[in-house]
């Protein structure tokens, strides 16, 4: 027999690998999975007890020094266990053989120096280099004006006896003219040729705004953008021989400063290399710093700038772009950009502290003017205007004027001979095209006909970078969306699995219940529960229990006395039958009544009246004739006799239960009233036949009583209705006497205090019994018969007049007993 073991936390893992615990490892040693070839035992097993022993429950108190805590997430594949050898003899033995080393063959290789390609075609056929093809294509396209002029030019050349010019030749000539003009103009600007401007000694550094220089800290000019910086201010460790270019000019970029709205100047990049900022802006903004002071790059801690500084608006340029600084005067909050302050000649001081710390002081336009006024008052009055050196603004305007003149004389920068030599065209043809190019450009306000190639490349590179970042963000969002979809799919899958397991469980329960019902039907036994309650679950009912006043002591004291004072005319026959029967018949009739009351009370829980039909079917299986026990209504004759007073006193409870069941559901059909009226005329012969049938079915009732556990008292309590409810739905047929009203008032008060009133929803909660529980079964039977008589008064007035005297005698005899 297989040894039982406790389940560990790792046993619940869903894996298909063979596993075993420490206790079953040696017991089932060799029971691993076998190979398909030789059927041998596996040489290894997976032990999960090591994983279980390693785990510590959360509720266990262990010294932190005695265990290690995993910081990473526990993986499900770890639950499969540890692979350990179980059958060492089944471990395959390796086999090998020594192979002699094969001698290497020397193959002939052709030297590369003897391989030459005489053609310019690519080595791979069908391969086309897109970049080379783009370079070979002409960038200029002729428009309608060019085509019209070309036609007129060809007519002139034909008259002169020269070869005509085709469209491609004219496009290439115009492209070469534009390219040479652009290159020569840039060279003139960079080398100051044609500008005729010589820088004087008052030029200042673009970073520190100081015109002084010293040994080892010379001022260096960029040969392209013409900015002037100190070596220490820009981080130039060694001045190169020849030309020098700043960082932006080396890369051929014209970036925008992230700290101010200005472009150009001494700029350095951030760590990413995609954002640029002025060195002066990085020095004057307190949150920003420079990583390497020797090289003055890269610019860091831009993210440390608070949002309040980004939200400041410059008082000089009125722009909210970038980050502004504020006036150093404590009472002044004027904001301005660093570069705007330099342009407006605001006072910007750099103070060296005693601890070799550099402090930056900046003043707004108002406070700078005050300081300038104080300084001008302290200056000597004999200062003359002998110093005629131009200011910085004058130099800037002079430079702009020279550049404008250079743009107007653009045609002087191109030589026709060089263009003709480069293209291999006759001078006359190139001269015609040169004249047309000059006139067309003059008519367009000296603007170039082609965009410079460098600008096109910059324009292509920047959108490409932007598109790359956009695609990266798009893919990131797409991945997040896919992750959300995956989680949703997992949750939906898990929900459907739970629903499937729940449905399978209900199906199994239904099949088992059907199997039990079939077994009971096949064995001829009565059903242990209602079929509709077994197979179909009713919705839950909500019952409101109301607190009623406690019963008075006087009512409880006289409740046993007045129980038998009143009885209906139908009870006379019942009393006579009771005295005429033996004790055995009375006991069997009581069992029969309890059996039926149990069915009726169970059926009331579902708000249905199908229990009577099921009781009828059980009596059909006993083998009696239908003609002797059934009417056209389908009810047993014994039930009709009990309802209308033809049975014993113990059967009188069935009458009350049937009426309470019908009224609790709020339905009392006309068929039931007709059957009750017709059954009241039962002959004495039928009564004797019913008594014999009840005596013969005692064994059947005893077998049925084993299937029910509810007592007679519980069934009675579930079927009792309040007297006030019954009294409200009926009208008395006659005026009672004073004595009868006095006796009938007491049970109504007692029942009202014991049973709370509620709506007729087919459900009645258990009632709290008063002192009447100590009464005998006989008095209870009479009380139920009395209530039934009040609830169902006799409709036959003739019969009521005949047996009125007998009713009084029966009432007095009940009181005496």
UniProtKB/Swiss-Prot annotation:
Which residue stretches are annotated zinc finger (C2HC pre-PHD-type)?
Answer: 254-288
The ranges of region (Disordered) come to 1-38, 375-396, 665-689, 719-817
What GO molecular functions are on record for this protein? zinc ion binding
Which ranges are annotated Polar residues under compositional bias? 667-689, 747-758
Q: Does the keyword Zinc apply?
A: yes
Zinc fingers (PHD-type), as residue ranges, are 202-252, 312-368
The protein's matches in CDD domains, at most eight in alphabetical order, are given as: ePHD_JADE3, PHD_JADE3
The UniProt regions of compositional bias labelled Basic residues, in chain numbering, are 801-810
SUPFAM superfamilies annotated for this entry?
FYVE/PHD zinc finger
Positions with biased composition (Low complexity) = 8-24
Under the heading InterPro entries, the entry gives: Enhancer_polycomb-like_N, EPHD, Histone_Mod_Regulator, JADE3_PHD, Zinc_finger_PHD-type_CS, Znf_FYVE_PHD, Znf_PHD, Znf_PHD-finger
One Pfam annotation reads EPL1
Q: Which UniProt keywords apply?
A: Metal-binding, Repeat, Zinc, Zinc-finger
Q: Where is the composition biased (Basic and acidic residues)?
A: 379-396, 722-743, 777-799
Organism superkingdom: Eukaryota
Q: Where is the signal peptide?
A: none
Q: Give the coiled coil ranges.
A: none
Matching entries from PANTHER family are given as: PHD FINGER PROTEINS (PTHR13793), PROTEIN JADE-3 (PTHR13793:SF27)
What family does the database annotate?
Belongs to the JADE family.
Q: How does it assemble?
A: Component of the HBO1 complex.
Protein role: Scaffold subunit of some HBO1 complexes, which have a histone H4 acetyltransferase activity.
Name used for this protein in its record: Protein Jade-3
Q: Which organism is it from?
A: Xenopus tropicalis (Western clawed frog)
Per the record, the gene is jade3
